[in-house]
């Protein structure tokens, strides 16, 4: 467990907040005029919220609780990755640009962290 953001950033697969926001801004800006793309963005957001809901309380769970929740956490993480991949393919095929996906990469932890940042931003926007 990391006690500070600085400690988190020392990890090989860390994703700095600023980088995550640059990626998210590219997705949002490029996809806003395309209804089908907005639906894929909304799907990603729903999957991200479901995943983050489980992940947020992970460090407070007992070992037994983690064992019970692990399959669901993995399932939700897989759905986040799938939604991200579908969004990327759509944006590529419709010439909206998906260079953000190369920047984000395919590392599971990094994609999960991206989902956490996006959910944080959504929470701030909801105030």
Enumerate the language-model features and the residues they cover.
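Charged, low-complexity interaction regions
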Residues: 31-37, 57-70, 93-98
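Short intrinsically disordered terminal tails
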Residues: 1-3, 7, 11, 122-127
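Amphipathic alpha-helical binding modules
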Residues: 82-127
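Short, charge/polar-rich alpha-helical segments
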Residues: 24-49
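Short, charged, amphipathic alpha-helical segments
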Residues: 41-42, 64-82, 100-105
């Amino acid at each position: 467990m990391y006690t500070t953001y600085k400690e988190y950033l020392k990890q090989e697969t860390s994703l700095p907040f600023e980088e995550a926001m640059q990626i998210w801004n590219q997705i949002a800006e490029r996809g806003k005029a395309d209804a089908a793309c907005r639906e894929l963005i909304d799907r990603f957001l729903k999957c991200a919220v479901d995943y983050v809901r489980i992940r947020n309380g992970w460090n407070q769970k007992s070992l037994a609780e983690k064992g019970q929740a692990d399959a669901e956490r993995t399932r939700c993480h897989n759905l986040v990755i799938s939604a991200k991949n579908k969004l990327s393919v759509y944006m590529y095929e419709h010439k909206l640009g998906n260079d953000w996906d190369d920047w984000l990469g395919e590392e599971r932890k990094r994609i999960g962290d991206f989902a956490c940042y996006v959910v944080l931003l959504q929470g701030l926007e909801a105030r």
